Amino acid sequence: MIPKGTVKRIMKDNTEMYVSTESVVALVDILQEMIVTTTKIAEENAAKDKRKTIKARDIEECDAERLKEKILQVSERTEKVNMLANEILHVIASELERY
């Protein structure tokens, strides 16, 4: 569902290394899992406020620690995730630590 071309372009814009199709597919799968996890946490946030609509603040208020844990879990889950995709996930996780 996430456009592979967009992901590949973002990856290539942030490295001087070559980006394999396999790494793009692996990262797309991981990003989709992250979206599902974030949505579930945001849904819990909306439900606490007795709403049926997920709002931006629900996403912003996602528990950074749970998201970080999931990101690291996914990045270490399989050997199919190559070094570049793994590094991108660690950068995302470290950015979450700031919040």
UniProtKB/Swiss-Prot annotation:
Top-rank taxon, per record? Archaea
Main localization, broad class = cytoplasm
Subcellular compartments: Cytoplasm; Chromosome
Q: Which GO terms describe its cellular component?
A: chromosome; cytoplasm
Region ranges (Interaction with DNA): 52-55
DNA-binding as a keyword?
yes
- MF-aspect GO terms: DNA binding; protein heterodimerization activity
User: Pfam family of this protein, just one?
Assistant: CBFD_NFYB_HMF
Q: Which UniProt keywords apply?
A: Chromosome, Cytoplasm, DNA-binding
Locate the site labelled Interaction with DNA.
12
Q: How does it assemble?
A: Homodimer or heterodimer with another histone. Dimers then assemble into higher oligomers, with the DNA wrapped around the protein core.
The free-text function statement in the UniProt record for this protein reads: Binds and compact DNA (95 to 150 base pairs) to form nucleosome-like structures that contain positive DNA supercoils. Increases the resistance of DNA to thermal denaturation (in vitro).
Name of the protein described by the UniProt record: DNA-binding protein HmvA
Native organism is Methanococcus voltae
Its taxonomic placement starts with: Archaea, Methanobacteriati, Methanobacteriota, Methanomada group, Methanococci
